[in-house]
């Protein structure tokens, strides 16, 4: 009996060690893919900024190319993150390897011609696709999903350089309110390996200083409570608006070619009229501006909000997370004087809590606040992100995300 238990224990530990080594392998492979994607996107964004708004002329035609690409060769790959959720839920057992390059190319096209979108979703799809492919070669229980979660963590960490955030996000995003504990032994080494390898090739996380903050007293706690409610509502509204705008546009313009072309014209005009391409791209300019001396306008956050939703609803590709960072931080700068708080501090709170509310996650936004702004601000991030998570009404930018809440 004792020997049997000992044998079982060794078997469990052997599996954990194997998962750790697999995680390192996944992290390294995914990181290289993220470097290609990230460096390519970096060049595209710099080129488009140098060219100014002239690239917007091609946005509707770029949309046609994206639809044609998926229609003729992408097929099921067009589901993107939706397919990742389907695999986790057992609705599908296959992520085609071609999904990664198709998402990369279509995202590059979107940004090359000035669309307002992010990059995180694509980074995680790259990781999920690559890791799920290797998962089929291992026979331990739920290896496909475990590898997929590890790949998502590696994808996030490889592009953003925030391994702790990546781990929490990958573990909690598939089913809100719970964690994929079984994937931890694979996701942790995958995430840290990806962050390290990508840093060797020049992909580093962004960090900002927000200065000193007063002690967490009753007055500040009340202000944080109100800020948490506000940021939570904005994040939830973004997720709600994205879901319903996509459905509305798809219902009104059923032909995907007409839809993306007509919406592409609308988005291009709006991007030019409002800000001369200020709201094109991932929103890095608004994020940096929020934490430096650059001018942030009172309408920056709402225009980035609307134009990102319109871009993604049209059928253009890209993520939502970096625009959410931009929306939250630029909103924080504007409302800080109302609360009598340091604008950099409120911008940091908005940066992480709007992201958390829109993705319906709790631990990841706290983690990214600490990794980007400093671990000493943990109590403040915890309070605001907790409130934002509570008030977002279970809305999520991921339509297939399941919720488990008592």
For the regions a language model picked out, list residue spans one by one:
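Alpha-helical transmembrane segments and immediately membrane-proximal extracytoplasmic
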Residues: 1-406
């Amino acid at each position: 009996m004792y020997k049997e238990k000992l044998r079982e224990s060794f078997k469990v530990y052997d599996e954990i060690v194997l998962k750790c080594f697999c995680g390192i392998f996944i992290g390294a492979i995914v990181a290289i893919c993220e470097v290609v994607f990230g460096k390519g996107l970096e060049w595209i964004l710099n080129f488009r900024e140098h060219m100014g708004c002239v690239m917007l002329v091609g946005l509707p035609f770029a949309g046609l190319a994206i639809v044609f690409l998926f229609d003729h060769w992408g097929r099921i790959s067009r589901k993107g993150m939706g397919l990742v959720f389907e695999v986790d839920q057992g609705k599908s057992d296959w992520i085609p390897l071609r999904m990664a390059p198709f998402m990369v190319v279509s995202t590059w096209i979107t940004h090359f011609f000035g669309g307002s979108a992010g990059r995180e979703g694509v980074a995680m799809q790259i990781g999920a696709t690559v890791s799920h492919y290797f998962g089929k070669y291992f026979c331990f229980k739920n290896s496909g999903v475990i590898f997929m979660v590890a790949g998502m963590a590696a994808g996030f960490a490889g592009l953003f350089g925030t391994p702790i955030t990546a781990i929490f996000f990958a573990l909690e995003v598939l089913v809100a309110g719970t964690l994929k504990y079984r994937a931890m032994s694979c996701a942790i080494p995958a995430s840290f390996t990806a962050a390290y390898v990508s840093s060797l090739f020049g992909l580093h996380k962004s960090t900002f200083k927000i200065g000193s903050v007063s002690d967490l007293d009753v007055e500040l706690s009340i202000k944080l409570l109100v800020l948490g409610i506000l940021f939570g509502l904005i994040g939830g509204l973004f997720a709600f608006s994205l879901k319903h705008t996509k459905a509305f546009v798809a219902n009104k313009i059923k032909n995907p070619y007409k839809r993306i072309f007509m919406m592409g014209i609308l988005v291009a005009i709006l991007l030019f009229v409002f800000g001369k391409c200020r709201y094109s791209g991932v929103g890095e300019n608004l994020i940096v501006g929020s934490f430096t001396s650059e001018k942030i306008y009172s309408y920056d956050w709402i225009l980035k909000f609307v134009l990102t939703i319109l871009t993604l609803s049209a059928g253009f590709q890209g993520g939502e997370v970096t625009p959410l960072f931009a929306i939250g931080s630029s909103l924080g700068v504007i409302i800080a004087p109302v609360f009598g708080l340091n604008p950099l501090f409120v911008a940091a709170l908005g940066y992480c809590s709007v992201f958390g509310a829109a993705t319906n996650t709790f631990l990841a936004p706290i983690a990214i606040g600490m990794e980007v702004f400093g671990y000493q601000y943990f109590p403040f991030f915890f309070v605001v992100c907790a409130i934002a998570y509570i008030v977002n009404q279970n809305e999520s930018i991921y339509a297939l995300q399941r919720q488990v809440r008592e």
